């Protein structure tokens, strides 16, 4: 993904303040609530029957944290997202059969959650930089599908 030096600075500056545990669970939880068809990939997570059940689900929180830790790895390797996410792309494509469109959805939900958490600090410039990053990550995760 091509980011200017300023965009990289905006992304990494904000990311240093992100509580990965909290934001990861919230982002994955919101994905499962806003786009309920994504729940079919999480059959083993137990009760996802209501928004409260989803947001309180320990497995959703744990997997959300795992997802954001991987996203953090991507932020450290912005010039090689395909390489960084190659194994995860293979796993999600070959074993889990996740629709790659879901990666875009999760990226957009993550942007919403960051905006919610950071308010005025999440300026349009910060959002624009994050939109580039989440699109790049989604593309890298979908790479095995092409």
UniProtKB/Swiss-Prot annotation:
Boundaries of every Globin domain copy: 2-146
UniProt modified residues of type S-nitrosocysteine: 93
Keywords, in A-Z order: Acetylation, Heme, Iron, Metal-binding, Oxygen transport, Phosphoprotein, S-nitrosylation, Transport
Phosphoserine PTM positions: 44
Any Gene Ontology biological process: hydrogen peroxide catabolic process
SUPFAM superfamilies the record matches: Globin-like
Lineage top rank: taxon: Eukaryota
UniProt GO cellular component terms: blood microparticle; haptoglobin-hemoglobin complex; hemoglobin complex
Residues the entry annotates as binding heme b: 63, 92
Modified residues (N-acetylvaline): 1
Transmembrane segments: none
Its biological purpose: Involved in oxygen transport from the lung to the various peripheral tissues.
Name this protein carries in UniProt: Hemoglobin subunit beta
Gene: HBB
């Amino acid at each position: 993904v091509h980011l200017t030096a300023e965009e990289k600075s905006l992304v990494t500056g904000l990311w240093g303040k992100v509580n990965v545990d909290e934001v990861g669970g919230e982002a994955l939880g919101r994905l499962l609530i806003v786009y309920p068809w994504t729940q079919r990939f999480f059959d083993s997570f137990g009760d996802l029957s209501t928004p409260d059940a989803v947001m309180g689900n320990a497995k959703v929180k744990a997997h959300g944290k795992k997802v954001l830790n991987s996203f953090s790895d991507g932020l450290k390797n912005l010039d090689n997202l395909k390489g960084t996410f190659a194994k995860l792309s293979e796993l999600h494509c070959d074993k889990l059969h996740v629709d790659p469109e879901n990666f875009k959805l999760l990226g957009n939900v993550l942007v919403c959650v960051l905006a919610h958490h950071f308010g005025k600090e999440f300026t349009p410039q910060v959002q624009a930089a994050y939109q580039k990053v989440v699109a790049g990550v989604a593309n890298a995760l979908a790479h095995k599908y092409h």
